[in-house]
A protein has these predicted regions:
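Conserved C-terminal helix/linker of AAA+ ATPases
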Residues: 202-228
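Helix-loop-helix "sensor" segment of P-loop NTPases
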Residues: 132-184, 198-211
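Walker A/P-loop nucleotide-binding motif
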Residues: 23-41
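Conserved NTP-binding/hydrolysis module of P-loop NTPases
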Residues: 50-53, 59-77
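Conserved alpha-helical scaffold flanking the Walker A/P-loop in AAA+ ATPase domains
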Residues: 78-93
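Sensor-1/coupling segment of RecA-like P-loop NTPase cores
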Residues: 31, 100, 104-140
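N-terminal pre-P-loop "Q-motif" helix
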Residues: 4-17
């Protein structure tokens, strides 16, 4: 079930990212799994003209993505010439910012490419951790990056998300009564909150009974582990 939930919160972080974009600074967008790094970048992609690379450990996929976004044909160039042409195009492009989404462990080859890009245009790295054993080859570069950290939702942000989902009739109005439970169960994690709201939208759970809430949480876990299974009652 694909649920279109409203994007709420993160106003402070969005304002900071817009400021850093204007200043042409490198950015390390840091946050644990589910904090909404990709969703935040997607909100800014079109307004700021971001060039977002896919989450990949393969340099070829990232290079192909950048070539496509810059309107470059692959042609018959060998890999070295393609790389040099791409870097030259990035340097000559106006107001380009390259985002490497989900930049986890980077190999020496990929890390070297990211460094080459960062010498020509501002780079944003979306990572779950800034520890060297998690990010790999790019770790020495991070001293040049401004840190923007996404933390768990405050209860008021959870309330805003639930209220927005109710207004858009994504979930029933009764959901407002369990906002505190939702925030506690998700520990403020936006991804888990959205998964719980998705389960509520299926309409299979009695939100007024503790047993119904336990089943709601169980179904969320089941859909997380086995996303292809419907688990419909």
């Amino acid at each position: 079930m694909n649920l279109s939930l409203p994007f709420v919160g993160r106003e402070k972080e969005m304002s900071r990212l817009r400021q850093l974009h204007q200043q042409r600074r490198h950015v390390l967008l840091l946050g644990a799994e589910g904090m909404g790094k990709s969703a935040l970048v997607e909100q800014l992609r079109e307004p700021l003209g971001l060039h977002v690379c896919p989450a990949s450990e393969h340099l070829s996929e990232i290079r192909n993505s950048l070539e496509h976004s810059l309107g470059l044909e692959a042609g018959d160039f060998d890999l070295v010439k393609r790389k040099n042409r791409l870097l030259k195009s990035l340097k000559e492009a106006k107001r380009v910012v390259v985002v490497f989404d989900n930049a986890s462990w980077t190999t020496p080859k990929l890390g070297s490419f990211i460094e080459s890009v960062s010498l020509r245009v501002p780079v944003w790295l979306c990572v779950r951790s800034e520890h060297p054993w998690d990010v790999g080859r790019i770790w020495p570069l991070l001293v040049r990056f401004e840190h923007v950290e996404l933390k768990p939702f405050h209860p008021k942000e959870t309330q805003k998300l639930v209220a927005s989902a109710v207004v858009k009739k994504v979930v029933p109005e009764k959901t407002l009564e369990i906002t505190g439970w939702l925030h506690h169960r998700a520990a403020g994690n936006p991804k888990i909150l959205c998964e719980l709201l998705t389960e509520i939208a299926r309409g299979h759970h009695d939100l007024s009974r503790p047993h119904g809430l336990r089943l709601l949480d169980l179904d969320r876990h089941l859909h997380e582990m086995f996303p292809a299974m419907p688990f419909d009652k």
